[in-house]
Amino acid sequence: MERNVVTAARRYCPEITADMDIQTVLEQLLIEENSQELAVKGPLKLKIWKGSEAKRVDLSDFTYGVVLNSQTVKHAMVEVEQPALKKIVTIENKTNYLAMEYDPEILYIYSHGYFSPLEREFLKKLQRVIEGKDVEVFHSGDMDYGGIRILNISRSIFSRE
């Protein structure tokens, strides 16, 4: 059954490419085997909802970074005011992400390869907040086909048009 789903997805879904492994294809279809986690490091202010109540969280307090599980990503809103944020860097490689020294003006986001649809929605929320503001966006990734595809996905999320 899994093979049939993956084959059909590769044939009919333009965002799915031949270089994606089975797990990545399933994630793109919102079929998750395990909980997704988004690792970030830097000055990001969130509002996390639980029912009708929201708690403000300042991730700059976590100078070594923090991992947001899928439920947190789903229920978090990016605060409109992000005064310290001057640069966003998406990073494909975990070792490179971990090696990035904390900078109070840079938000590092570990992509672990392709961002899941849930992560892309969260990053689009971030994009809407920084739109029209003086925030630069960069990507660090491998210089191979997959790395270029991830760069293009990151560009589509953080489009400045």
At which residue positions do the language-model features occur?
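Acidic beta-strand-to-loop metal/phosphate-binding motif
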Residues: 134-144
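Nucleic-acid enzyme cleavage-core boundary/entry regions
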Residues: 1-90, 94-110, 116-128, 146, ...
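Short loop or secondary-structure boundary microenvironments that flank
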Residues: 112-113, 141
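Active-site lining segments that contact anionic ligands and/or coordinate catalytic metals
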Residues: 103, 134, 151
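Glycine-rich phosphate-binding loop signature in dinucleotide/nucleotide-binding domains
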Residues: 130-132
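Gly/Ser/Thr/Ala-enriched C-terminal appendages of enzymes
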Residues: 142-161
